[in-house]
Amino acid sequence: MSQYKTIAESNSFIVLDKFTKYFEVNEAPAIYQTEAALEKEFIQDLINQGYENPTNLNTLEAMLANVRVQIQSLNNVEFLDGEWTRFVEEYLDKPSDNLVEKTRKIHDNYIYDFVFDDGHIQNIYLVDKINITRNKIQVISQFEQTGTNANRYDVTILVNGLPLVQVELKKRGVAI
């Protein structure tokens, strides 16, 4: 086993002077790598870094249910079904919001004052920007999106259940 020198360390992370990819240690080197193999390697690297890899998130309904679980966990709250529907319609996936307004929710307006059915008001966070380790990071593959444009992304990274990064992988040597 190689010896590594620590460059920086905190309670949340560690930076070492050298990084060896999982596949380099555990697999024979491949001369030709398919796009599927590249995707598998990328996902495994993310899993090795602590990302969860739920395999049941293949429909819009499953994604929305996952967002609910993650938002409830982040905010230490339990939504009733009616409250969750209202939260989604009033704020999270407001029908009148365009792409820019939805993006602003993550960057600027990521805290929403939600009034629960019993009358109490609570700040609901989409992401925790102060203590980032509280955010749940997940990676899924081959999620199909329908709508005005039907897309299927190779890898999608979810932050608290929200699809914030979509990656389209290409095998080496192929012009894009």
Outline where the language-model segments fall.
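An alpha-helical interface "stripe"
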Residues: 1-176
